[in-house]
């Protein structure tokens, strides 16, 4: 799918007519509800030699030793059978993350609606922390809303509890008297 290889920012005319920004070229299909195991496999690969950021871990995290032990106690057989991805492919993805200056992980409603969604998102946070991919441009966490209109609403500042300033501006601009209680 084109969107998996290059991104064009729809509000930047130069990007829309240009080539876009290269984002990925490795597609790894995962078993249903196998995301947590895949991310645990990535953590295992990253910790065992594919590249952590020790300075970032030391300065911005806590509990690394306990996490490292939990990861090392998770066997490859359990990981690969649960996620349905070969160890080699997980390690290939871990190497790509190691070589990336900035990694961002996006997910949508499917991931958040699994029985183990919280643990899966925590594991995503952990692998980004391992490489220092939080708090810098082009890196971090990116939960994507389930419907385009929901995301678009948030992008333009619409939410279920609009600020007093927004409501005042709406009233002054349109003459509409919006409700102020929510």
Regions found by a protein language model. Give the residues of each.
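Cofactor-pocket helix-loop regions in the catalytic cores of large enzyme subunits
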Residues: 1-148, 156, 170-182
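Flexible, surface-exposed loop regions and adjacent strand-edge segments
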Residues: 157-162
